[in-house]
Amino acid sequence: MKTIMVRYTTTEAHALTNEEMIRAVFADLHARMPKGIRYDSYRVGIGATFMHIATLDAPDDNPLTTLPSFLAFQKQLKDRCVEPPVVSDLSPVGSYR
């Protein structure tokens, strides 16, 4: 199992477009229901900073990379950003649900 976090800040002008593209990814996920992934996305406060957390059962098998909506989202992400994406590996300490 592997968990990664991606955090970045878009321009104010691109924040809504970015959010719409994220919603398209979730629509694809709900339609296709891939196994082996847990995926969450957050907008930090009311600003233009976003955070995504993906937990993959198999680190070498990321179902997101097979989704056209995710590929479209990623394609121009750097162009929408004022703070580029930072990818971090996360190690679990505890969880409660």
Can you name each region flagged by the protein language model?
Residues 2-9, 51-53:
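Active-site-flanking beta-strand signature of metal-NTP-handling nucleotidyl enzymes
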Residues 42-44, 95:
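Short beta-strand micro-motifs enriched in acidic
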Residues 45, 90-91:
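Residues at the C-termini of beta-strands that transition into short coil/loop
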Residues 24, 28-38, 54-88:
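An amphipathic, aromatic/His-enriched active-site/gating alpha helix that lines ligand/cofactor pockets
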Residues 11-13, 46, 57-59:
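Short coil/turn motifs at secondary-structure junctions
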Residues 9-20:
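Short, surface-exposed ligand-recognition loops at beta-strand->loop->(often short) alpha-helix junctions
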Residues 36, 45-48:
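Short acidic/glycine-enriched loop/turn segments that link adjacent beta-strands
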Residues 91-97:
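Short, low-order "capping/linker" segments at domain edges
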